[in-house]
C-alpha cells in the first residue's frame, strides 16, 4: 500500500457542523435500536482498520468495560495532536466537527473503508462521555468529552511512550439509545471476525469484562479470505479445496476466493476497502460475468456443451458456490450507489475483477480437470432443473394460471376482503382446527387465513424443481403471489405481513423452522424487509369469579403466570393451552390476532453469514454439528408446564410491538 500520504493536522478537512446529530441520530447511524448502538463501535473500529489497510499497525483491541462503556485501541500512527488550520486542536476537530476526517481530499489515506473522522464525531455526539488517548511522537495525549460531545478537558500531555496508536473509550447516551445501551458480544464478534478475515496481517481481540459475562476471543487469519470461505461453508459437504486468485488492474487490488458445495443456492460476499457491500455492485458483476464466460468457454472446449447447445446461465454455474470478492479502491475512484455504502458504483471495479478472474480461472480449470468437468456437469443439471422450475412457474402465471391457482387455493385460503396490499396480513396456521378458529376470529377486512395441513418440505436440502412439487409450499407461493427464488419481487406481494401461527410445542416449532428456512432461502427480500412474523399465542388462561365479577387473564410466560397467580389470589381456574385449537375464535382474536393486544416476533436477518450457517446447522444433512448446537443452546429437562419463552434472550413486547428475533 502507498504510505506516502501524510496523515497530519493539515490532512484533516472540515466540511460542516455537528449540531443535528443528536436531534436526528437515525440520519447518521440508521437507527437508535441495537443496530445503531453497535454501529457506533463499527465507526471507531473502521477508523482503526483504515490504518491497517494503509499499512500502519496490525492490532486492534475491543473491550467491553465493567461499567458498560467500550474501548477500541489500535497500534497505528495515532491521531494528529497538533493545531488544525482552523485554529483548534486537531483531536477536538476530529471529535466535535462532522465530516472532519482524513478521508476527504485523500489527505491521509490511499484507500479508506469508513469516512474517517466522521464516525468519531458522530459517536461523540451520541455518547454520555468519550475519552481519547493517543500515543504519537513519543508522547501520550489525552482528551475527554461529555454530554454529547462537549470538551470537558483540553488535549493534555500525560507522559512519554514508545508505542504509537489511538484508544477511544465511550459510553453510549441512554437518552438517545432508550431501548438499551448494553453491547452484545456475539454481534460485535461477527463484524470483527469479518474484518480479520479480510486483512491477513490484522490481529483483533474482543474482551468482555462485565460481571458474569467475562469472555475473550482472538481473530487472526493468516490465509485471509481463503479461511473466510471455509468458515462460511462449515457444516456443508464441499466439493474441493478453496481456490484463491489475487491481482491488480486499473489501480484496483482484487482478491477472490471460492469453493463449491453440494447445496443448491449461491452465497457471494463482496467487500470494498473492508466494508461489506450487501447489495453487491460493479465488483460483484465483474466476478459473475467472468465466471460465466470462462465456464462456458471451458464447457465447449471439453465438448460438454455442443455447438447447438445454448450457453449455461450464470445462475446455473453458481449453484452451490460460496465466494468472497474483496477489492481495494483508491479514494478518487470510489463511488457508491445511493445514500448507503451497500452497493458499489465504481465502473473500473467491474473490469478490474473481470480481468483478474478471466486471467486466473482458466488455468485453475485446466489444472483441476476432473473437478472442472464435474462442476460443468453440475451446472448442466442445474440448467435442466431450472427449466423444469421455469415451466412450473409459467404454469402459475400463464393462461392455466387462474384455473390451477383456484384449484390449489379452493378450500384452503380464506382471503381478506380488502385489496390493500399495504395493510393485508396472511396468517399461515398449523392445522385445520386452529385454521377454523382463526377464520372465525379474524378481522375479515385485512386478515387472510391459510391453514397448513400437509408436510412442509425442508428447502435447505431440496432443488427448486422439487419444492414446486410440495403442495404446502406451492400453495404459499401462489398465495403470496410475488414469485420465488431469483424471480421473487417483493413489490408484487399480496400481503404486507406474513405471520406464522403454530402450537407452542415441538411440532409447532419444527413447522416454524421449516417455513423460516423456505422464506430465508427463496423469499429472502420478504425477511430482509421485516415482513415475516411469528405469532405468540398465550400459554395459560386464568379465570376467576362469575357473571359481572368474572375476570379472565392470559399469560405468555411462567413469570407472567406467577405474577397473575399472586394478583388473583385463591379460587381461580388455570388452563394450559397445548394447541391453538383449544381456543375459541374470540380468545384467538383477543390474544393472538388483534393488532391492539397481540404479541408478534419479527424475524430479522442481521448477519447473512451467521444466519446462513445457522440454517445449515439446523436443517442440513450433518447430524454432529446440529447435535453440538442443540447441546450448547437448548436446555433439556423442561417440564410440561414450563415455557419455551424462559430463554432470557427473547423479549416479549405487547400491543403489536415486535421483538426482533434473528434466524
Curated annotation (Swiss-Prot):
Amino-acid positions noted as binding ATP in the UniProt annotation, renumbered to this chain: 7, 47, 74, 114-120, 341
InterPro entries (alphabetical): DNA_gyrase_B_C (IPR002288), HATPase_C_sf (IPR036890), ParE_type2 (IPR005740), Ribosomal_Su5_D2-typ_SF (IPR020568), Ribsml_uS5_D2-typ_fold_subgr (IPR014721), Topo_IIA (IPR001241), Topo_IIA-like_dom_sf (IPR013760), Topo_IIA_B (IPR000565)
UniProt record, GO biological process: chromosome segregation; DNA topological change
Pfam families tied to this protein: DNA_gyraseB (PF00204), DNA_gyraseB_C (PF00986), HATPase_c (PF02518), Toprim (PF01751)
Ranges of compositional bias, category Basic and acidic residues: 387-398
EC category: isomerase
Record-annotated Toprim domain positions: 424-538
Domain of life: Bacteria
SUPFAM superfamilies for this protein: ATPase domain of HSP90 chaperone/DNA topoisomerase II/histidine kinase (SSF55874), Ribosomal protein S5 domain 2-like (SSF54211), Type II DNA topoisomerase (SSF56719)
Catalytically driven reaction(s): ATP-dependent breakage, passage and rejoining of double-stranded DNA
Record's keyword terms, sorted: ATP-binding, DNA-binding, Isomerase, Magnesium, Metal-binding, Nucleotide-binding, Topoisomerase
Annotated site, Interaction with DNA, chain positions: 455, 458, 510, 626
Record function comment: Topoisomerase IV is essential for chromosome segregation. It relaxes supercoiled DNA. Performs the decatenation events required during the replication of a circular DNA molecule.
Protein family per UniProt: Belongs to the type II topoisomerase family. ParE type 2 subfamily.
PANTHER family noted in UniProt: DNA GYRASE/TOPOISOMERASE SUBUNIT B, DNA TOPOISOMERASE 4 SUBUNIT B
Record-given protein name: DNA topoisomerase 4 subunit B
Species per Swiss-Prot/TrEMBL record: Staphylococcus aureus (strain NCTC 8325 / PS 47)
Species classification: Bacteria, Bacillati, Bacillota, Bacilli, Bacillales
Encoding gene, per UniProt annotation: parE
